[in-house]
Amino acid sequence: MLMLFVFGVLLHEVSLSGQNEAPPNTHSIPGEPLYNYASIRLPEEHIPFFLHNNRHIATVCRKDSLCPYKKHLEKLKYCWGYEKSCKPEFRFGYPVCSYVDMGWTDTLESAEDIFWKQADFGYARERLEEMHVLCQPKETSDSSLVCSRYLQYCRATNLYLDLRNIKRNHDRFMEDFFQSGEIGGHCKLDIRTLMSEGQRKSPLQSWFAELQSYTQLNFRPIEDAKCDIVIEKPTYFMKLDAGVNMYHHFCDFINLYITQHVNNSFSTDVYIVMWDTSSYGYGDLFSDTWNAFTDYDVIHLKTYDSKRVCFKEAVFSLLPRMRYGLFYNTPLISGCQNTGLFRAFAQHVLHRLNITQEGPKDGKIRVTILARSTEYRKILNQNELVNALKTVSTFEVQIVDYKYRELGFLDQLRITHNTDIFIGMHGAGLTHLLFLPDWAAVFELYNCEDERCYLDLARLRGVHYITWRRQNKVFPQDKGHHPTLGEHPKFTNYSFDVEEFMYLVLQAADHVLQHPKWPFKKKHDEL
């Protein structure tokens, strides 16, 4: 039976246990639904895609007069894109390419396909196609280990961790944390294949360092009572990037979301364990976001120190800085934008955090300027720029400073999601562009010679991006003073030509008004 389970993982026919795999209650109390539909907690637009991959729930819904999703049963051909049976015309979305990057390919069609595989649900499909069994179970109570290439993602059953003798220091990602016999399972290990997957061994790129000591045990950890603690709930292991930087931390969250797709499970009845081999804590300015993925507090690995811990189902999540991963330093083909994956991620997070769209307002464009209270990259003539914006009657202007001590992250998201033009200097705060409405524009006031970072993120999300172009109309305070590198454009402050600024903002406004998803189609002649 477990053999079928493992092969099911390879074929993407089995989901991680949790809400998606809960057996429908076909003997429910009269007047009660046959399934706990409220546990699905997905945006309405995502429901047909969920039902496509969970046909058992679709079948129950069809029979259940109380199912709220009956209208979606006629759309079961809709699919995310990574499913083997998914036809391109039914995918959640498809990128748009405006020109061909001849360094990559020679047709628009192939450019779209490349971008889809680099940064859209095609990326999830490639991870699924890489899956192979590294530790083969023979019986139902055995363990298993299934991984993608380079051990960037793994899934284990009946996993044994022995933390009785571990030693912690200042290193968050020790490579020799476990010795032979301290991590493993009762299954037939293909040690040769396991050891061949270490080419990308690196803390935030692979799980090879953690799993290279995986051992074929001569006992069944749970059945033979070798565990001090047995974790029944599905558990995600994650190695986290910087929790104080939104750009880096959201590489964690997007990869957790992709991992959920690979598992075909969006249940929040799961544990998340932060894999950290140090004794330190973890500063997290965006901890509210975890509520989109789990009902429980994030667990530090050190919680289990001095114990033998067994996990019935464990997932080693995709990592934040993988080579050719998403979205840190990802090489992307030029000329393409708008991935369904990043749009779905934004919708998923906003839905689960109860962030709603309160507008837009007819006759108004909501403009938000992100101010900086840091030492560098301040807008020196900010008041002058704001006063110029206020001369346009259709602009509703607000200035915000996303300081976590004064404005919680959920409140920040509410402001961002209810913004039509988002303006800010180069910096991690621009990662908020992920949560702008589809019709919005982001104006990176000055990119400080880091041209690709937020341009590429805007392309991934599918929102319009503009930045300052005329160097003779931006005025740095000085040449910048990096602590070790000397002169550096990110380490100074700037003022801007007001006329050029207004020209660019009006361009952004024109894009907003012309966007197909802008609810008000009439002309705004006042602009």
Swiss-Prot record:
Motif Prevents secretion from ER, residue range(s) on this chain: 524-527
Coiled coil: none
Keywords assigned by UniProt, alphabetized: Endoplasmic reticulum, Glycoprotein, Glycosyltransferase, Signal, Transferase
Catalysed reactions, semicolon-separated: L-seryl-[protein] + UDP-N-acetyl-alpha-D-glucosamine = 3-O-(N-acetyl-beta-D-glucosaminyl)-L-seryl-[protein] + UDP + H(+); L-threonyl-[protein] + UDP-N-acetyl-alpha-D-glucosamine = 3-O-(N-acetyl-beta-D-glucosaminyl)-L-threonyl-[protein] + UDP + H(+)
Glycosylation sites noted in the Swiss-Prot or TrEMBL record: 354
Catalytic activity, EC: 2.4.1.255
Single GO MF descriptor: protein O-acetylglucosaminyltransferase activity
Gene Ontology terms: biological process: protein O-GlcNAcylation via threonine; protein O-linked glycosylation
Signal peptide from the UniProt entry: 1-17
Purpose: Catalyzes the transfer of a single N-acetylglucosamine from UDP-GlcNAc to a serine or threonine residue in extracellular proteins resulting in their modification with a beta-linked N-acetylglucosamine (O-GlcNAc). Specifically glycosylates the Thr residue located between the fifth and sixth conserved cysteines of folded EGF-like domains.
Name of the molecule in the record: EGF domain-specific O-linked N-acetylglucosamine transferase
Biological classification of the source: Eukaryota, Metazoa, Chordata, Craniata, Vertebrata
